[in-house]
Curated annotation (Swiss-Prot):
The gene is rev. Residues 99-108 have a biased composition (Basic and acidic residues). This is Protein Rev. It comes from Simian immunodeficiency virus (isolate K78). Keywords: Host cytoplasm, Host nucleus, mRNA transport, RNA-binding, Transport. The RNA-binding motif binds to the RRE, a stem-and-loop structure present in incompletely spliced viral pre-mRNAs. This region also contains the NLS which mediates nuclear localization. These overlapping functions prevent Rev bound to RRE from undesirable return to the nucleus. When Rev binds the RRE, the NLS becomes masked while the NES remains accessible.
């Protein structure tokens, strides 16, 4: 993988993490009882921790190998070519045509 491809892959990952970050609501504020505010903060903290764990997995996910066995198999299949198949024979072998000669009977 060239350095340009690696940089592009890193940019994709960072854009995905940035998009995930934008989907999380901001830190909760607002009216409500102390218990309601506490519950909102707990839910927000759980979502934030999930986002951090997901971002870590996205960022640290290894690059796919360029020459996996599947890629090699696909390349080999692409190199195959169908050749012309010869016409079948028009005459039948005599062993198949002669009904008196039984090929299953033991030879004397």
């Amino acid at each position: 993988m060239s350095s340009h491809e690696r940089e592009e892959e890193l940019r994709k990952r960072l854009r995905l993490i940035h998009l995930l970050h934008q989907t999380i609501d901001s830190y909760p504020t607002g009216p409500g009882t102390a218990n309601q505010r506490r519950q909102r903060r707990r839910r927000w903290r759980r979502r934030w921790q999930q986002l951090l764990a997901l971002a870590d997995r996205i960022y640290s996910f290894p690059d796919p190998p360029t020459d996996t066995p599947l890629d090699l198999a696909i390349q080999q299949l692409q190199n195959l070519a169908i050749e012309s198949i010869p016409d079948p024979p028009t005459n039948t072998p005599e062993a198949l045509c002669d009904p008196t000669k039984d090929s299953r009977s033991p030879q004397d």
